[in-house]
A protein has these predicted regions:
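N-terminal targeting or regulatory segments adjacent to alpha/beta-hydrolase or S9 domains
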Residues: 1-55, 321-326, 371, 399, ...
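N-terminal cap/lid segment of alpha/beta-hydrolase-fold proteins
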Residues: 35-80, 321-346
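Short beta-strand element of the alpha/beta-hydrolase
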Residues: 72-76, 82-93, 347-356
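Cap/lid segment of the alpha/beta-hydrolase catalytic domain
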Residues: 97, 102-106, 110-157, 356-362, ...
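Gly/Ser-rich "nucleophile elbow"/oxyanion-hole loop immediately N-terminal to the catalytic nucleophile
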Residues: 138-182, 386-404, 409
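Hydrolase active-site cap/lid region
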Residues: 191-238, 413, 417-447, 452
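Short beta-strand/loop motif that positions the catalytic acidic residue
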Residues: 261, 267-269, 273, 444, ...
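C-terminal catalytic histidine-bearing segment of alpha/beta-hydrolase fold enzymes
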Residues: 275, 282-327, 471-501
Length: 501
């Protein structure tokens, strides 16, 4: 177990272990010459072949400096006039988040451009050309050749270019192009804002890609940083050349970019992080000399932090009142039930969100407002049971014309047993728990969208097969190599399913 911290005071004096190379600025000035005045050849194509009332969804692609075709998701709210735009960068080694997740920004009139990093989990492919091992990740992909051929140098140049792409888009306010991300995404937002001094705001959460020597010394050289351990074991087992490697990696250390940021910054540190060391997160924060505000999250590791998400839209739009439509911790009269509520005047549809694992907040729920739904989210309580869900559903049926229930784990099981009501239009269920005789207890016959998970320890292949056989009115997707987690594909299927109801 890595060290867990209780406050920023314990890490505030953290310093970098490697100095910025003397020729760092010269190196990057040379790299930027490769991307100046190139033909971006920007292309847009409709992403989903159906109409959404409040947002347009596109796949965008452009040519990078070496002929690589870089792919992005582009979302634009259907509003008049120019909009601000967020450059949203994803974590390692994933892909841009689902359209549904990104659409939370568009509910408040913000466009989004989300790049897929080359050679990772999205649509952008890596053309190769780097010299070095590739077995354990991008940190060592190119480490044995010229540093300018390292894959992260190429990704950083793509990051520079995606800002240039954003400036070319119609109806975007060029003065309000901002950047955001967590982990690798935070690192790329730092790089983007450092190379484009005109960027005025960035939001960062537990940045990756920094102080590789300290990461190694603290034994965080696994998971995201596993390439460091692999390289040491197989190419330098006695460690005699490690300092040379760390000196080389300093050219892609985001702490060396952080001092070049002019933007206003909000910065989140996860004090129990087991992937991106809190000490390293703190040392990156110290390098930022522009206007900055720190948020620390005690007890949080490398995970979704909803409280940080809720700071994004008010920060970018400079209006702290923008979450005033979110009503947390509301007690439902006579039911002894507490809920979080996000609602919009005039909505006659409601989405009831039931998740025993995590308490989502306003940023997450804004995507449902886009589709015309108010949201009620049950605050988790170990004493809640099937009767709790049934009573809450009956309460909402008295307030709204249409109800959709989105439920996970045991709440998904409970939902199948809810008393049927014609106002319940659909169920969206993920992570059902195997339960004996559940199919004899099902009361509800509305439309159902269900995801089953191939490596979920709480269910079996036989149970998943019975779901397909026994449930009617079912749209069903099976994800054989997923456990209980967020699935981009299923998120966008939720969006389309809700839009068609």
């Amino acid at each position: 177990m890595k060290k867990i911290y209780n406050s920023f005071n314990e890490i505030k004096d953290a310093n970098k272990s490697i100095n910025k190379p003397l020729d760092f600025d010269k190196f990057w000035a040379k790299q930027l010459e490769k991307v100046k005045n190139i033909d971006l050849n920007i292309k847009l194509e409709k992403a989903i072949d159906e109409n959404f009332e409040k947002v347009e969804l596109y796949y965008l692609s452009f040519d990078s400096f070496d002929g690589t075709r870089v792919y992005c998701k582009y979302l634009r709210p259907k509003v008049d006039g120019n909009t601000p735009l967020i450059l949203q960068f994803h974590g390692y080694p994933g892909a841009s988040r689902s359209f549904f997740e990104l659409s939370s920004y568009t509910q408040k009139g913000i466009s989004v451009l989300a790049m897929d990093c080359r050679g990772q989990g999205g649509r952008t492919l890596d053309k190769g050309g780097s010299i070095g091992p590739t077995v354990c990740g991008h940190l060592i992909n190119g480490l044995l050749g010229d540093m300018e051929d390292h894959i992260y140098v190429k990704i950083f140049l793509d990051t520079y270019l995606v800002y240039e792409v954003a400036k070319e888009l119609e109806d975007i306010d060029e003065d309000r192009i901002y950047a955001s991300g967590s982990s690798q995404g935070a690192a790329l937002a730092i790089v983007c804002a450092s190379l484009h001094k005109e960027i005025k705001k960035i939001a960062l959460l537990y940045p990756f890609l920094s102080d590789y020597k300290k990461v190694f010394e603290l034994e965080y050289d696994e998971i995201a940083y596993e390439g460091l351990r692999y390289y040491s074991r197989w190419f330098d087992p006695t460690g005699e050349n490690l300092d040379k490697i760390f000196d080389k990696l300093a050219y892609i250390d985001v702490s060396n970019f952080a001092g070049g940021i002019n933007a206003d910054v909000i910065y989140g540190i996860s004090l129990a992080d087991q992937v991106c060391p809190p000490l390293v997160q703190a040392s990156v924060y110290k390098q930022i000399s522009s206007n900055k505000k720190l948020y620390t999250f005690k007890g949080f590791g490398y995970e979704k932090i909803c409280s940080m998400e809720d700071k994004l839209i008010p920060f970018f739009l400079e209006d702290e009142s923008l979450n005033s439509d979110y009503l947390p911790n509301i007690e439902i009269e006579n039911l002894n039930i507490k809920v979080n509520i996000l609602r919009h005047m005039g909505h006659r549809k409601c989405l009831l969100y039931l998740n025993p694992s995590i308490e989502m907040k306003s940023f997450y729920f804004r995507r449902f407002l886009n589709l015309g739904y108010d949201v009620y989210s049950l605050i988790c309580n170990k004493n809640y049971n099937e009767d709790t869900i049934d009573n809450l559903v009956k309460y909402l049926c008295n307030k709204y014309d249409d109800i959709v229930i989105m439920a996970y784990r045991e709440f998904a099981n409970y939902t199948l047993k809810v008393t049927s009501n014609k106002k319940i239009k659909a169920l969206i269920l993920q992570g059902l728990i195997e339960e004996k005789d559940i199919f004899n207890k099902i009361n509800i016959s509305c439309k159902k969208l269900i995801a089953t998970l191939g490596i979920d320890e709480m269910t079996s292949e036989d149970f998943n097969g019975q779901l397909l056989e026994k449930l009617d009115n079912l749209e069903y997707y099976h994800y054989p190599r997923y456990m209980y987690e967020r699935i981009n594909d299923f998120e966008d299927r939720k969006m389309q399913f809700l839009n068609k109801l």
